[in-house]
């Protein structure tokens, strides 16, 4: 009896020690995963990081889950190895083999897969998207600027890796008109019932049969979902020419000013309706430059110019506004000249950072950044160098 009791005590002690050891290992693993996330995936707007450490049913330490960034997964494994814990690796990276193109003039992307979800951004027709998850009604996608959100499956058309490669090599045109245009069923149609769709600045289409054909001044085009139609050829530019542009502040400001009076829309990223950072994105994209999505992200790019030095700003520089005590950026504008800028606040309009100007706004001006000369630095990408748009060797 005494021997049995002693054995039970020893077994309980061993189990307790094992449980304690597992708990310690789990704590180390949780800390390691958190450290990796802090280092490589702090911005959930751009990186999916659904990796967690846990004990399985047998009490074994497991680290599993998905991330959209291979560097984040490598960081997790490195942190775990540095912590000296033994674990089963069930982590994985979303593959780069599922793609989509936006099929409507402006698709709304939301923070969750529901129409009641907050609108995070938009993509215009022909925008290439990396597909992370497919549901029956919502797809989780990543836009070329890295932004991750959910888009209705009805707003996109899916492509395989080979189909996406073929699209990148196809004869494509981009809408460079600042104003909305109509696509008609025939080259001579003008009636309201003859409209296939509208297109906005930045929409990308292909040519029917792979060869540009113009009839009655209209280009015969194919939309991402296979629909065809005709639109005024003068509104299109071959995508290679658009992407080859040099920095042109006049082009950027022309697009921005063409939207004057356009209503503000949170998450709006098209000429239909637009928010402050969307105005910067759309205007720069017209010049072939892809900016980050949000003002707080854009504020960390380019060359910084202090607010007190606003007189040294040049046309096309971005101005950032927000909380003077915390430095938190909440608004962005595009600088023109002599303190004047264009921005979206309620509507697209003009104001000034010059305290002596009648159009001066009291919202604290924090700093500016210069995009010119900083292309291909973090957060600023020329479309011609983006592998989703072109085959980049």
Question: Where are the language model's segments positioned?
Answer:
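N-terminal targeting leaders
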Residues: 4, 8-9, 13, 19-127, ...
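Aromatic- and glycine-rich peptidoglycan recognition patches
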Residues: 158-167, 181, 189, 237, ...
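SH3/SH3-like beta-barrel superfamily modules
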Residues: 60-62, 66, 73, 120-152, ...
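Glycine-rich catalytic cores of cysteine/serine-nucleophile enzymes that process amide/ester linkages
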Residues: 186-188, 194-199, 212-218, 261-274, ...
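Beta-loop motif signature
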Residues: 101-130, 176-207
């Amino acid at each position: 009896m005494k021997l049995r009791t002693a054995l039970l005590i020893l077994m309980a002690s061993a189990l307790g020690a094992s449980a304690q050891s597992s708990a310690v290992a789990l704590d180390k693993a949780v800390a390691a995963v958190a450290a990796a996330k802090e280092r490589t995936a702090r911005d959930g707007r751009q990186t999916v990081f659904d990796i967690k450490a846990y004990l399985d049913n047998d009490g074994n330490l497991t680290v599993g889950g998905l991330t959209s960034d291979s560097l984040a997964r490598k960081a997790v494994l490195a942190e775990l190895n540095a912590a000296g814990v033994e674990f089963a690796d069930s982590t994985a990276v979303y593959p780069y083999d599922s793609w989509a193109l936006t099929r409507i003039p402006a698709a709304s992307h939301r923070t969750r897969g529901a129409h009641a979800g907050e609108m995070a951004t938009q993509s215009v027709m022909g925008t290439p998207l990396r597909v992370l998850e497919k549901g029956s009604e919502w797809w989780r996608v990543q836009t070329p600027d890295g932004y991750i959100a959910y888009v209705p499956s009805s707003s996109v058309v899916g492509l395989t890796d080979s189909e996406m490669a073929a699209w990148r090599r196809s004869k494509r045109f981009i809408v460079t008109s600042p104003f909305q245009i109509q696509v008609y069923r025939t080259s001579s149609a003008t009636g309201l019932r003859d409209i296939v769709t509208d297109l906005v600045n930045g929409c990308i289409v292909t040519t029917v049969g792979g060869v540009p054909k113009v009839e009655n001044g209209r280009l015969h085009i194919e939309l991402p979902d296979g629909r065809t139609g005709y639109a005024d050829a003068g509104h299109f530019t071959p995508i290679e020419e658009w992407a080859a542009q040099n920095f042109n502040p006049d082009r950027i400001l022309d697009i921005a000013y063409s939207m004057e009076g356009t209503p503000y829309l949170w998450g709006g990223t098209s000429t239909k309706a637009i928010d402050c950072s969307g105005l910067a994105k759309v205007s720069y994209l017209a010049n072939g430059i892809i900016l980050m999505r949000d003002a707080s992200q854009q504020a960390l790019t380019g060359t910084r110019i202090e607010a007190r030095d606003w007189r040294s700003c040049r046309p096309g520089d971005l101005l950032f506004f927000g909380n003077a005590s915390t430095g938190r950026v909440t608004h962005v504008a595009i600088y023109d000249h002599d303190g004047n800028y264009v921005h979206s606040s309620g509507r697209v309009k003009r104001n000034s950072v010059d305290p002596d100007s009648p159009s001066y706004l009291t919202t604290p001006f924090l700093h500016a950044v210069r995009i010119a000369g900083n292309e291909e630095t973090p957060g600023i990408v020329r479309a011609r160098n983006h592998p989703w748009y072109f085959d980049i060797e």
